[in-house]
């Protein structure tokens, strides 16, 4: 009779819900030509475990003004966020679950790119694909820094 109590306890314990661990998920996207300039960006969504901060944003790096000047050389660059429709019309490629430390490192990288001085955007050496690649490398992924596809985010 008393042997059934441990079995019932284990059964009950296995059926009760366990609080989900808070985490931020980084999803890497690309956006095709069409009505918009092609683009690569990272969407962050979730909850920072240590602070409880809810995160739902995205970051990409682009020229302040998309004009023929980007074909001639470096121009002013900026970090930008896109709206829900733009994201819905984009292509998610992969996602990574971030620890609080990884999230903090990624946000520091975003801040660094946001504060790059002068003409920081270059179609050939510092564009949205480079930004996404550096974010992926920062999070521990292997990247090909010699790729010929830096002008083609998809």
Explain the meaning of each model-derived region.
Residues 10, 46, 136-137:
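Residue-level marker of positions within ordered structural domains that often coincide
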Residues 12-19:
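C-terminal segment of classical bacterial N-terminal signal peptides
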Residues 22-24, 55, 107-154:
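Activation targets extended, charge/polar-rich intrinsically disordered C-terminal tails
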Residues 34-37, 96-106, 121-129:
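Solvent-exposed, acidic/flexible segments
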Residues 28-31, 90-99, 114-122:
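Second-shell loop/turn segments in exported
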Residues 22-92:
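Glycine-rich catalytic cores of cysteine/serine-nucleophile enzymes that process amide/ester linkages
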Residues 1-8:
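Bacterial N-terminal signal peptides that target proteins for export
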